[in-house]
Amino acid sequence: MPTSVPRGAPFLLLPPLLMLSAVLAVPVDRAAPHQEDNQATETPDTGLYYHRYLQEVINVLETDGHFREKLQAANAEDIKSGKLSQELDFVSHNVRTKLDELKRQEVSRLRMLLKAKMDAKQEPNLQVDHMNLLKQFEHLDPQNQHTFEARDLELLIQTATRDLAQYDAAHHEEFKRYEMLKEHERRRYLESLGEEQRKEAERKLQEQQRRHREHPKVNVPGSQAQLKEVWEELDGLDPNRFNPKTFFILHDINSDGVLDEQELEALFTKELEKVYDPKNEEDDMREMEEERLRMREHVMKNVDTNQDRLVTLEEFLASTQRKEFGETAEGWKTVEMYPAYTEEELKRFEEELAAREAELNARAQRLSQETEALGRSQDRLEAQKRELQQAVLQMEQRKQQQQEQSAPPSQPDGQLQFRADTGDAPVPAPAGDQKDVPASEKKVPEQPPVLPQLDSQHL
């Protein structure tokens, strides 16, 4: 998996365990018992996707006296070849148990990572072979997912060493692409201007470049002139009494007996300030970081004889005895004096940008079409919704009308008017419609029966 490592972070992890600190760097206080007010130095993130696992393994191994002793006596080849990893068989049971648990946690983390990755790319019901997928992670042994063995330590060290060693090359490539993009945008901007405006923009650019080149002489990193300038201006000491050993001790910030990459890069600050000022429009801070990296690489190439990315006192003192240490009259050539790319590389880069832009435009067009289709679908749904609401309203109105028609009439004051119940009584015919009826056919109203009266004597 790709890694991105912040500047200066890769090799700060495990002094005084010097050899393994070529892979990591965990600042450790050499003084015997730690005081409560001594705060542990925060470990910088290497940028590796397995940084936490790597750090925790180192922290656990550091607690074992036997392994720590063997590590201090080992050289870089013993570590890289895997010879030191065999000492894992002799660490305490408690340490092995902690390492086993760390590995199980790492395997579990990778499984979840892989599952999320596969779910994003494939069908959810697809069966995933986690064993095969774990093989793409080279910092652990996928054949044994439960215990931490010598092979795990060997793979962890080798993978971290390789990944961190690739940091500088990746940084240079990133800077090249940055410079090509900057030039591409500059040319496109000039093409968009009229002739007079273009001439003015080109004149302004040339003026900025001229101001950027006008700076004091930059000393060669690691040279006598450069170190003496730090000695005088940063350390405030007499340049005529420059002492390389004292200089080394002063700038070994964590007193671990070596100058790591951050400690070396701190020595270049005065030189970089001669060329780059964040307040100046013509000074690019990305170029300054590239310059810092070039300076560090130059020192490492000439001073770090065993290529463990750490400068020991012996290596530093030996470098001050070389002829090149004092012969630096020409000074250091800054990054703008070396083209970061060729015209052919720029052409390929612009073709890549054009292809990517065309792809993005096509994708944007598809999204626009899909958005329009969704809009039309939404309009249809809204129309159907309005029709449905209108139909419901009409039904409610009809229902209300039917209820009003079936209700009894009401008096003017709003009260309902009810008729008296006439029973079986005949309804008189309207006047004028009555006909003469024979007396024999006329109904005589029935009289109630007459009861005989009883004399009071009979009671």
From Swiss-Prot:
Residues 192-220, 393-459 are annotated as: Disordered. Its main location: Golgi. The modification Phosphoserine is found at S85, S368, S456. Residues 192-209, 433-445 have a biased composition (Basic and acidic residues). Gene3D superfamilies: EF-hand. Residues 171-217 bind DNA. Keywords: Calcium, Coiled coil, Cytoplasm, DNA-binding, Golgi apparatus, Guanine-nucleotide releasing factor, Membrane, Metal-binding, Phosphoprotein, Repeat, Secreted, Signal. One of its GO terms (molecular function) is guanyl-nucleotide exchange factor activity. It is found in: Golgi apparatus, cis-Golgi network membrane; Cytoplasm; Secreted. Changing L313A: Decreased binding to GNAI3. Further decrease in binding to GNAI3 and loss of GNAI3 activation. Ca(2+) 1 binds at D252, N254, D256, E263. A motif (GBA) lies at residues 302-332. It is a peripheral membrane protein. Residues 1-25 form the signal peptide. One of its GO terms (cellular component) is lumenal side of Golgi membrane. GO terms for biological process: regulation of protein targeting; small GTPase-mediated signal transduction. Belongs to the nucleobindin family. Discovered as DNA-binding protein in the serum of lupus-prone mice. The EF-hand domains are unfolded in the absence of Ca(2+) and fold upon Ca(2+) addition. The GBA (G-alpha binding and activating) motif mediates binding to the alpha subunits of guanine nucleotide-binding proteins (G proteins). Major calcium-binding protein of the Golgi which may have a role in calcium homeostasis. Acts as a non-receptor guanine nucleotide exchange factor which binds to and activates alpha subunits of guanine nucleotide-binding proteins (G proteins). This is Nucleobindin-1.
